[in-house]
């Protein structure tokens, strides 16, 4: 199923020097976001930098949201993860997409212009309405949490 999402190009290099975000394969869940920086950027160990992607989106449908997620190779090989762990893009947000890059390694990381640094995934959203109760109906789990079910 393909849902149309409005996309605004904020950096003219997108669509000319660098492709629009797209799914790499028919089974891809995410589209790569690129570092649309003006010059090479070095992220020191322990440092967090906000990196522009050169695009803005407007999801519009309140039944959807976008998530900005890390790319597995950057985290595993270089220690580059998202400073906020997951970026949530609400359906009514229309501003530029930025990526908070955190270098959790002990070596500097160099980000080149146009490098793929995160991925954009669209997910369904359910807005809940709370119902106040004095007690919950019992369940098998009850109040067990934080390791309650063990590791084996």
Swiss-Prot record:
Gene3D superfamilies according to UniProt: 2.70.40.10
Catalytic function, reaction form: dUTP + H2O = dUMP + diphosphate + H(+)
Pfam family, one: dUTPase
Ligand binding (substrate): 71-73, 84, 88-90, 98
EC number: 3.6.1.23
Main enzyme class: hydrolase
Cofactors (names): Mg(2+)
Keywords for this protein: Hydrolase, Magnesium, Metal-binding, Nucleotide metabolism
Any one biological process term the GO annotation gives: dUMP biosynthetic process
Pathways per UniProt: Pyrimidine metabolism; dUMP biosynthesis; dUMP from dCTP (dUTP route): step 2/2
Chain coiled-coil ranges: none
GO MF: dUTP diphosphatase activity; magnesium ion binding
Function of the molecule: This enzyme is involved in nucleotide metabolism: it produces dUMP, the immediate precursor of thymidine nucleotides and it decreases the intracellular concentration of dUTP so that uracil cannot be incorporated into DNA.
Family indicated by similarity: Belongs to the dUTPase family.
Protein name: Deoxyuridine 5'-triphosphate nucleotidohydrolase
Source taxonomy: Bacteria, Pseudomonadati, Pseudomonadota, Gammaproteobacteria, Alteromonadales
């Amino acid at each position: 199923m393909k849902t149309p999402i409005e996309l605004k190009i904020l950096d003219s290099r997108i669509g000319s020097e660098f492709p629009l975000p797209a799914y790499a394969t028919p089974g891809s869940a995410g589209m790569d976001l690129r570092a649309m920086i003006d010059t090479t950027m070095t992220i020191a160990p322990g440092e967090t930098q906000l990196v522009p992607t050169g695009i803005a989106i407007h999801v519009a449908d309140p039944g959807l949201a976008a998530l900005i997620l890390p790319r597995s190779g950057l985290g595993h090989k270089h220690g580059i993860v998202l400073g906020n762990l997951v970026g949530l893009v609400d359906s009514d947000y229309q501003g530029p997409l930025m990526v908070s890059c955190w270098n959790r390694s002990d070596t500097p990381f160099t980000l080149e212009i146009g490098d793929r640094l995160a991925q954009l995934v669209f997910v369904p959203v359910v807005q809940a309405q709370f119902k106040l109760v004095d007690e919950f109906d019992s369940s098998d789990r009850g109040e067990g949490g934080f390791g309650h079910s063990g590791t084996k």
